[in-house]
Swiss-Prot record:
Residue stretches of biased makeup (Polar residues): 1-12, 20-30
Keyword Isomerase included in the entry's annotation: no
Name of protein: Putative zinc metalloprotease TRE2
Taxonomy of the source species: Eukaryota, Fungi, Dikarya, Ascomycota, Saccharomycotina
Gene: TRE2
Cellular component annotations (GO), alphabetically ordered: membrane
Every PA domain range: 255-349
Disulfide bonds: none
The EC number(s) this enzyme carries: 3.-.-.-
Length: 809
């Protein structure tokens, strides 16, 4: 910093002896001169009268105070000394020095003892190898390294037992309950606002679980919804009494209609036997209008068909009670899947009309149907006289049918019809890593005009949980299935299975090429465990499947469930797949399959299931069920060899053929079918032999490593196996029911036993033959037998000769 003091000039001597300044940027000026020698006397003449300045000059310099540096250094020294005294010295004294002493003592002691055995230098290395081997084993077995256990694989294929063990720990029952609660929070009939909310929820769940493809596939189909409904009856005094009805008194796909003062007749379960009995007794007569009062049977659409056949103008169904609650109403669909499933408008998916000859086979009833409660049914029954005949209720009870004119009723049903209404399916996909042109479908129905907790919501919640389990296994182990998996939530179930049917109709060829199995879980419920004598508890599951897969399901029975396996025996969203030869499997709980109350009523709410799930045993049953579903689906999609057992397939058909022959002896010639089965049996033996050889090479000796040539052979076998089902179809379909192409497996038009032995008839095998027998047309029955034999032989020949993927067009 510059001083305000201005210096005067000095001599060179003075400059050389000047004291340096504190700052190099300034000049220190001297106000006096210094002389080394004393002054001489000769200099007295020189006067040095120099007057000092009145005030000393002011200097402003930036000079650091050395005391500050000293203070800082002292503080750091104190910290350093404190750290050394309190931490380093105790650490050295109490830990490091003892450890060093031990490290010197232990080797010396070890060498001392080892020297008694042998050379310590060699023995020390020997024990070191053992110790390090133990460490390596622990690390490898713990899964910290990326080995077979950590990756869930062995060689080229997955080790499912490892994946399942992880899945057992990953089941999120809380998520299952949350999904079930939300889906059950509102009625969600097809095409309603409730359905829109639910299918968006499912779509978001698919997205959140990271499915590669999530797609909404919508279709415009005929649908109807609750509207105006009324039933009135007249007493002996001709006074009119109204039944109190609501929107719950509704059968989806019922026709609209209005009747005035028509006789009411009670018909029990409405079987052909019941109504023929009424007709023989003149209780009902041709040309006279009447309304049938019926108890619900297992197959409601068949009741409607028979009622139409006998001239009924409307049907009133009496609901089953729910415990002591006799006011619940069961809203069962009345579409007619016997002729075909799908859009009930009579139009094909592309809008073209159905052929004229098929108009009478539309999928919708032609008469009004209305469900009422048990209480209301009793009220109407009490008005019938003792005239007419006694009719079996099907519940070990009998009631009077009444007679014409006993009770007159008015019926008015006006539903809200939408000729073309949007119905969506939600599709998600996990892509396979090997044969990505082949896939299975895991599906569940979505819609209910009520809350639908038991059916179908339980199955939908299970579907979402299975998706989550698959993805958790995928992310944990880097797992991918060998083949594709599709997850589908079907819409339009109450409208004659419109969603699944339209999907099959629009994409039939790609589906037949890719899909080799469909698993439907719509009818699942809590598998309530029953206690046995040995103290174990086991729930029950019913599996209806294709004969090719029967051995697979019997072999993979779950230790906590009693599983019964049979052929498919009822309608559902799987029906259009079955009709076109695609093997299907339906996993059900008996109570849900039979639609026991409160299913299909307004009482089927989440609160009831929530209380059931408070029991730990029921919680465990649900967890076991989800793991079992994951197990069977993973085995189907990720095992190298398809689980299609041809010998079991042949034996099953042969067994059902024998039943048919016993039911109708000396009526039909089954030689052509037997020849076809023998051809398939030979193929089955070759497949079993090849399978055994493959397992010996890959698993027994190859440790999961498959040679390339063997892989190609395996893919060829798998592809040929997937064509078995589709090749049992006839392009023309069944007589009068062209929708059903599968000549081996499918529904009989009317499922009533007319055999002599009774009770031993299968209504879902050889449907064309059974239709002809029901009509007493034995010539047509033999033609259908011969057609089945021809199809079996041709499909076997194609299997042997096949080089390309050939199917009926």
């Amino acid at each position: 910093m510059r001083s305000s003091y201005q210096p005067v000039s000095t001599t060179n001597f003075e400059h050389e002896n000047a004291i340096p300044t504190a700052s190099s940027s300034h000049n220190l000026l001297m106000s006096q001169r210094f002389d080394d020698s004393p002054p001489s006397s000769n200099d007295n003449s020189i006067e040095t009268n120099i007057t000092p300045p009145p005030e000393p000059p002011s200097y402003e310099f930036d000079i650091e105070d050395p005391h500050d540096d000293l203070h800082k250094r002292t503080h750091l020294q104190r910290v350093s000394i404190g750290f050394q005294e309190k931490i380093l010295e105790p650490l050295m004294e109490n830990i490091i020095h003892p450890l060093l002493q031990i490290s010197k003592f232990v080797p010396d002691k070890a060498d001392y003892y080892l020297s008694k055995i042998g050379n310590p230098f060699i023995l020390r290395r020997f024990f070191y190898i053992i110790f390090m081997s133990f460490i390596a084993y622990y690390v490898l077995s713990s899964g910290y390294l990326f080995n077979e256990k950590a990756s869930g694989s062995k060689g080229m294929f997955s080790q499912h037992d490892i994946l399942f063990e992880y899945a057992k720990k990953s089941v999120d029952l809380a998520k299952f309950e949350r999904d079930l609660e939300y889906i059950s929070s509102m009625p969600h009939g097809s095409g309603t606002k409730g359905d829109a909310a639910i299918y968006r929820y499912i779509q978001e769940s698919f997205d959140n679980n990271g499915l590669k493809l999530v797609k909404e596939m919508g279709y415009s189909v005929y649908s109807n919804y609750p509207g105006n409904v009324s039933i009135s009856y007249y007493d002996n005094k001709n006074e009119k009494h109204d039944l109190e009805l609501s929107k719950e008194n509704f059968n989806p796909l019922s026709s609209n209609g209005k009747l005035s003062k028509v006789s009411l007749i009670y018909g029990g379960k409405g079987t052909t036997y019941d109504l023929q009995h009424l007709k023989d007794s003149k209780t009902i007569e041709d040309g006279k209008d009447y309304v049938l009062l019926l108890q619900y049977d297992k197959l409601v659409s068949q009741q409607v068909l028979i009622a139409e056949k006998f001239g009924a103008k409307a049907v009133i169904f009496i609901s089953e009670p729910y415990g002591e609650n006799i006011d619940v109403v069961q809203s069962k669909p009345v579409g007619l899947p016997q002729y075909s499933t799908g859009d009930a408008s009579g139009l094909n998916w592309d809008g073209s009309p159905v052929e004229e000859k098929d108009h009478k086979f539309w999928r919708q009833t032609h008469i009004p149907t209305i469900p009422i409660s048990t209480r209301q049914g009793k009220e109407l029954l009490s008005r019938l006289s003792s005239g007419g005949v006694t009719v079996d209720d099907g519940n070990s009870d009998r009631s009077n049918s009444g007679k014409m004119g006993d009770v007159l009723i008015d019926v008015d049903l006006q539903t809200n019809v939408r000729e073309k209404h949007f119905i969506p399916n939600i599709v998600g996909k996990i892509e396979g890593r090997e044969q990505s042109d082949k896939a299975i479908i895991i599906a569940a129905s979505r819609n209910s005009i009520n809350f639908g907790t038991t059916y179908p919501n339980f199955g939908t919640a299970a579907l979402l949980s299975i998706v989550q389990l698959f993805q958790e296994v995928k992310y944990k182990f880097g797992w991918k299935p060998l083949r594709n998996i599709y997850f589908i939530s079907f819409g339009g179930t109450e409208f004659n299975y419109a969603g699944s049917s339209e999907l099959v109709e629009q994409r039939l060829t790609p589906l037949k090429d890719e899909i080799y199995s469909l698993i439907d879980i719509s009818q699942l419920g809590i598998p309530f465990a029953e206690k046995y004598e040995n103290g174990k508890t086991r729930g029950e599951l019913s599996i209806e499947t294709h004969p090719l897969l029967k051995k697979f399901f019997n072999r993979n029975a779950h230790g906590n469930f009693d599983i019964s396996v049979d052929n498919v025996q009822h309608y559902g969203d799987w029906t259009p797949f079955l009709a076109n030869g695609i093997p299907v499997s339906v996993i059900s709980s008996d109570s849900t399959r039979n639609r026991d109350t409160p299913t299909e009523t307004s009482e089927d709410k989440f609160e009831r299931v929530e209380k059931i799930l408070e029991d730990e045993q029921n919680q465990q049953s649900v967890k076991d069920l989800l793991v079992y579903l994951l197990h069977i689906s993973m085995e189907l999609i990720d095992d190298p060899l398809l689980h299609f057992d041809i010998i079991s397939y042949v034996e099953d058909i042969d067994e059902r053929l024998q039943r048919l022959e016993q039911a109708y002896p000396e009526k039909l010639n089954f030689t052509s079918i037997i020849k076809g089965l023998l051809f398939w049996k030979k193929i089955g033996s070759e497949w079993a032999s090849w399978t055994q050889g493959w397992e010996n090479i890959v698993w027994s000796h190859g440790d999961g490593i498959e040679p390339s040539l063997l892989s190609i052979n395996r893919w060829t076998w798998n592809k040929k196996l997937t064509n078995i089902g589709r090749r049992t179809c006839s392009p023309a379909g069944l007589p009068n029911r062209s929708f059903y192409k599968n000549v081996l497996f499918g529904p009989t038009l009317i499922q009533e036993d007319k055999s002599k032995n009774g009770g031993n008839v299968d209504f879902w095998t050889f449907p064309g033959v059974m239709d002809a027998i029901y009509d007493d047309d034995w010539k047509r029955a033999q033609e259908q037998i011969d057609l089945i034999g021809k199809v079996l032989h041709q499909s076997a020949a194609l299997f042997v000769e096949e080089t390309n993927d050939i199917g009926y067009k």
